[in-house]
């Protein structure tokens, strides 16, 4: 029996993981040692990146589109020719538009319609409930505390009557809805102390990777060329995770705990190297 559930089966989680891995794939294409960089490695890495970019399209995950946009902005920092990068990214985006399915456009269009989208409306209500819950329970309610929530909100509902579309505002009651945000997930389950520790864990990792990137970027020794780019790749992956985590409850996602572990390992290696 093979358990194929790697905890990334949900569409938004899968899209976030895929986009977060792209900077690390790029690093392996340039600095890998198991498969030294050559034409075949670059071709395989390029195909893998293309597959990662297709995942948000196939899953129609709005979070994936946001993560792609964030990755595009982050990579501006490290590219040598920013103008060429912007032109190439724009050209690829324009060429891809005709191949996207109509359902993808319809799904992405809901990004700007919070009031009419039930998913977005539910998230806002859950977040509001979590803030109230944390005010009464500052130490949190433990795992799955969201199962105790219940709220009523107003939502436009469109239905066909007599051959015409009629939109009415209806009261919708919901209960036991998930947090749809790792920040609120930590707040509701672990309280303010847990949220602060979780934020500190990621903030310290980002700051440490930035410190390593700056200290190692100008080194010229052949054995000192991979540390700075790896710190940058891990930093980008962490930022993309935090962006994706803003819209889904993946605070305990193992993939990103592994990412934290890689940051700790790199930091320890660099500290010993310089000591």
What name fits each language-model region?
Residues 50, 54-59, 78-118, 128-135, ...:
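A membrane-periplasm/extracellular boundary helix in multi-pass inner-membrane enzymes
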Residues 1-4, 105-112, 252:
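Membrane interfacial helix motifs at helix-loop boundaries and amphipathic/re-entrant anchors
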Residues 2, 41, 118, 124, ...:
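Alpha-helical membrane and juxtamembrane elements of multi-pass inner-membrane transport
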Residues 189-238, 262-263, 268:
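Hydrophobic transmembrane alpha-helices and their immediate junctions
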Residues 249-258:
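Extracellular/periplasmic helix-loop-helix junctions in multi-pass membrane proteins
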Residues 1, 6-78, 86-93, 99, ...:
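Alpha-helical transmembrane segments of multi-pass inner-membrane proteins
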Residues 29-43, 80-81, 225-228, 268-275:
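Transmembrane signal-anchor hairpin modules in multi-pass inner-membrane enzymes, especially those
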Residues 112-128, 139-190, 213-220:
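Long extracytoplasmic/lumenal interhelical loops at the membrane interface
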